[in-house]
């Protein structure tokens, strides 16, 4: 398996991970926006990405793009929050560009999205770019819920 990834030159930030499993058909892509990248890279999918792939297959997509509201790579949100620039210098550019390639955009960044007001910023950025964001559910605080913590058959909702 190989995933196309776009990293910063020092690999401190991962802006985009693309995973496609059916090259015989035209690309039908879904974009997911999480909190921040973990260790997933060109060679491996983490549990969240495997869950996302299952959702995409169920809904007849053959590709997904994974982006995040913060592009800094960390497995712990506490570590990400200590970073001086967790967003990354090119993240907003990649969010807008990638959204143009996708039939569906699903937000899933959870409650930590309130850090630096980033949840509201990204919703405004993509809404201003003419995009409609969806989610699989919301946290108690009203943020788009993470897919690992939801049943596999949950229905999409517009944010």
For every predicted segment, state its role:
Residues 80-159:
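Glycine/proline-rich loop-helix segments at beta-alpha junctions forming the active-site rim
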Residues 11, 15, 46-53, 85-93:
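Short acidic (Asp/Glu) patches
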Residues 38-60:
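A short mixed-secondary-structure module that forms the rim of ligand-binding clefts
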Residues 37-39, 71, 112-113:
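Short, glycine/serine-rich, charged loops/turns that create anion-binding
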Residues 29, 62-63, 104, 132:
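Residues at the starts of beta-strands that form the adenosine-phosphate
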Residues 62-78:
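Short connector loops at secondary-structure junctions
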Residues 1-46:
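Active-site and ligand/interface coordination hotspots across diverse enzymes
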């Amino acid at each position: 398996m190989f995933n196309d990834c776009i990293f910063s030159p020092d690999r401190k930030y991962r802006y985009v991970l693309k995973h496609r499993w059916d090259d015989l058909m035209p690309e039908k892509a879904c974009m997911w926006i999480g909190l921040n990248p973990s260790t997933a890279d060109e060679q491996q999918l983490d549990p969240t990405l495997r869950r996302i792939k299952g959702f995409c297959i169920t809904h007849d997509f053959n590709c997904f793009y994974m982006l995040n509201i913060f592009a800094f790579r960390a497995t712990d949100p506490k570590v990400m929050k200590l970073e001086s620039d967790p967003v990354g210098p090119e993240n907003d550019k990649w969010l807008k560009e990638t959204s143009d390639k996708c039939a569906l955009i699903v937000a899933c960044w959870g409650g930590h999205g309130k850090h630096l007001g980033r949840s509201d910023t990204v919703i405004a950025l993509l809404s201003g770019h003419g995009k409609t964001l969806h989610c699989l559910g919301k946290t108690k605080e009203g943020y788009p819920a993470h897919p690992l913590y939801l049943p596999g058959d949950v229905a999409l909702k517009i944010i």
